[in-house]
Amino acid sequence: MSTTVTVLTDTWSRRAKRLEGDAKILAIGTATPASWVDQTTYPDFYFRITNSQHLLEHKEKFRRICNKSKIRKRHLVLTEELLKKNPNLCTYNETSLNTRQDILVSEVPKLGKEAAMKAIKEWGRPISEITHLVFCTTSGVDMPGADFQLTKLLGLNSSVKRLMMYQQGCNAGAAMLRLAKDLAESNKGGRVLVVCAEITINIFRGPSLEQDDNLLAQCLFGDGAAAMIVAADPRPGLETPLFELVSSAQTIVPNTDSHLKLHLREMGLTFHCSKAVPSVLAENVEDCLVKAFEPYGISDWNSIFWVFHPGGNAIVDRVEERLGLGPEKLRASRDVLSEYGNLTSACVLFILDEMRKKSKKDEQMTTGEGLEWGVVFGFGPGLTIDTIIIRSVPIN
């Protein structure tokens, strides 16, 4: 009996010490391309620019998909001028990887820089204090990578510790929070700059009569970048936390390898999403919640704030229904989906940014819609689910 008590006491003692040093998000910045498309008129543009106007039934099907998406607009680097200069991007099966790569290796770091500069400005500290840079994108692959290019664009120290993550998919935003937490808590005085930048040029192509997944991809994804500064030991009076990263977990849903897949081919990045994905995610989300929140005695999912990756409207609806969430719980996720589309890795950071800004505007008590505890959910190929427990901070 005494041995058991000692073990429990030690466990709680270690946990208490760990909580005292949890990583904090100190600043968030976001950026989007200047050009954007209206979802209601996009089917006309898409079938015209890809010389596919004769596919009338396919066009009407695409229009229905866009109308059901609950997306109002999306920002895109792709413009009519760019597509006319590179017509090989507009045909479904055209060899075009070189063209896509040439655009992405230039544009991804630039968009990342815009978001990073906003985060650094809000942080308010000298850029020389950044000790780590973690860059994530599903848009292209290059060496030296986007992390190297961003280091030069920002003028970071040549000794900054860099890590480049390519091809992680939609769960990468939550995974980056997990990685930033581990880095910040393992390096005293560390200041981690995290950047997620996504551009959909790799996935854009004309319609295919055989591949309906392609139409979903053309409707769903948008371009954007998000950045944040993370540290475990913020300086009082000099740095102001926005959220606290409490714990993190990742799990693979068994027997779902083929449910969500992206493959890099000569034609670019191909996309497949099974119709079962919304149901499978809804069936597995609660188990992740229970395991994550059990140590903290939380089991009412309406008592926490939600930063849920909006992979698509059907997924958001199914999870909301399965967990019995109130309509306001996933509002921030729905708002980001409506205004930007699915931003892949950048999505959850956009949601965090929107949430803390709206919480302040609405005169809430905390950055998390007035609540203390919250969860970040990301999911992607695998199916892989990342679960991050976060805490808000009081709004002064």
From Swiss-Prot:
It catalyses: (E)-4-coumaroyl-CoA + 3 malonyl-CoA + 3 H(+) = 2',4,4',6'-tetrahydroxychalcone + 3 CO2 + 4 CoA. GO terms for molecular function: naringenin-chalcone synthase activity. The keyword Membrane does not apply. Pathway: Secondary metabolite biosynthesis; flavonoid biosynthesis. SUPFAM superfamilies: Thiolase-like. Keywords: Acyltransferase, Flavonoid biosynthesis, Transferase. InterPro entries: Chalcone/stilbene_synt_C, Chalcone/stilbene_synt_N, Chalcone/stilbene_synthase_AS, Polyketide_synthase_type-III, Thiolase-like. It is an enzyme of class 2 (transferase). Its EC number is 2.3.1.74. Disulfide bonds: none annotated. The active site is at C170. Pfam families: Chal_sti_synt_C, Chal_sti_synt_N. One of its GO terms (biological process) is flavonoid biosynthetic process. The primary product of this enzyme is 4,2',4',6'-tetrahydroxychalcone (also termed naringenin-chalcone or chalcone) which can under specific conditions spontaneously isomerize into naringenin. Belongs to the thiolase-like superfamily. Chalcone/stilbene synthases family. This is Chalcone synthase B. It comes from Ipomoea purpurea (Common morning glory). The lineage of its organism: Eukaryota, Viridiplantae, Streptophyta, Embryophyta, Tracheophyta.
